Amino acid sequence: HLATRTALHAQNVITPMTEFGHNIGDDYWLATYTELTAYWQKLASESPRMVLDTIGYTAEGRPHLMAIITSPANHANLEQHKTNARRLALANDISETEARELSQTAKAVVWIDGGLHATEVLGAAQLMEMAYQMVSLDDAETQRFLDDVVTLLVHANPDGMELVSGWYMREPDPMQRSTGGIPRLYQKYVGHDNNRDSYMVTQPETENISRIMFREWYPQIMYNHHQTGPSGTVLF
C-alpha cells in the first residue's frame, strides 16, 4: 500500500524527509511552528493547488496561517466559491429552488484544524502531512477531493506548538525527550482552556478562527482534531 501511494506522488514538491530529515510522525522528533510555516511556504510556492493566507496574529505575535488547498481551477474562482458557501449558509437571499440548484455546482468547504491543545502533538503533525499529500498525490481520489472541495487547514495554537516542540527538542538525547514539565502555559493567557474560549472569543487565535468560520468561509464540515494518550494514542 505504501509503495502504491509513493508511486502516485507525481507532483514535484518538497517531501517532509527532504525538508526536515524526518518523515511526519517519526519517533522522538517534533517540528516547531516556525518549521511548519517554512514548509507550508515552500509547498505553496511549488504547487498551484495551495495558497497561504495570514488570517491574523497570535497572542505572542506570530502569523496565524491558513492553507487553502483545492484544484487550480477552483483557486481561479475562489471568491465565487466563498460567496456560494456564504449564500447557502445564511440562506437569506436565496430561495429553496435556487439553493438546491447552487448546491449542485458549489464546492464543499472543509475546515481541518489541529494542535489546539499543543501537547496533543498529532494534530499539528497531520496538518503538515495532509498538506503534503494533497498537493503531491495524483491518484483519482485526491483529484476528486481537489475538484469538489475547498480544504482549509489551520493550526489552532501556533504559540503552543512553538513552545511544546521547542521544549521537547531541547534535549539532545532523543530517549530523554518529553512534553512534560513545560514551565508555562501553552497559550499565553488561557492555556489548556483555549477550547472553551470558543464561546467567549477573548483570544486572538479564537477571533481569527471564528471570523473565518462564521463570517467569511462558512465551512459545511469542520474537523477539530484532538488526541488521547499517552497509552493507546488515538487522533480524534
Predicted feature descriptions by range:
Residues 1-236:
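M14 metallocarboxypeptidase catalytic domain recognition
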